Curated annotation (Swiss-Prot):
Protein name: Regulatory protein RecX
Gene3D superfamilies hit by this protein: Winged helix-like DNA-binding domain superfamily/Winged helix DNA-binding domain
Keyword Cytoplasm on entry: yes
The encoding gene: recX
Lineage of the species this protein comes from: Bacteria, Pseudomonadati, Pseudomonadota, Gammaproteobacteria, Pasteurellales
GO cellular component, one term: cytoplasm
Similarity remark: Belongs to the RecX family.
NCBIfam families from the UniProt entry: PRK00117.3-3
Keywords in alphabetical order: Cytoplasm
Matching PANTHER family: REGULATORY PROTEIN RECX FAMILY PROTEIN
Organism (species): Haemophilus influenzae (strain PittEE)
């Protein structure tokens, strides 16, 4: 096994968590062979220095603190970080996050002067903001005093 490949991964992991996908990409950029990458990753995973599950838990917590909903977090983990859907589903299911309460807090923070008598244009702006942050319409529609059917 290439100690250079192993040392490279350990150096990266000493700074922050990475998904396996991210580490593979970084190592490919440094022109390590697939065999070297597989061996180095296997060794780190055996020592529990790299774990997609732990990475996903940490990523979930950091994105929740920034006000993102389950839809956006799921998409980022899958598409940008390469985490398997099974791991994402497990981590989300085990999290004790109240997505409705989170949507309510985000709405109050972003739109502090909001009331249900706002104009349709303002409600549409809020609707788009919440969707872009990964919240499902059923998590925030009643917060803005709208039925989902009003926007269809």
């Amino acid at each position: 096994m290439s100690s250079l490949a192993f040392n490279y991964i350990v150096n990266l992991l000493s700074r922050r968590e990475y998904s396996e996908f991210e580490l593979r990409n970084k190592m490919q950029e440094k022109n390590f062979s697939e065999e070297e990458i597989d061996e180095a990753l296997s060794r780190c995973q055996a020592k529990n220095w790299q774990s997609d599950r732990r990475f996903s838990e940490n990523y979930l917590n950091s994105r929740v603190q920034k006000g993102y909903g389950v839809g956006r977090i799921r998409q980022e983990l899958r598409q940008l970080k390469g985490v398997s859907s099974d791991i994402i589903d497990e981590v989300l299911m085990e999290s004790e996050i109240d997505w409705y309460e989170m949507a309510e807090n985000l709405l109050r923070k972003k739109f502090p002067n909001y009331n249900e008598q706002q104009t349709p244009k303002m409600k549409q702006k809020i609707w788009q903001y919440m969707l872009s942050h990964g919240f499902r319409s059923d998590e925030f529609a009643d917060l803005i005093g709208q039925n989902q059917s009003e926007w269809d």
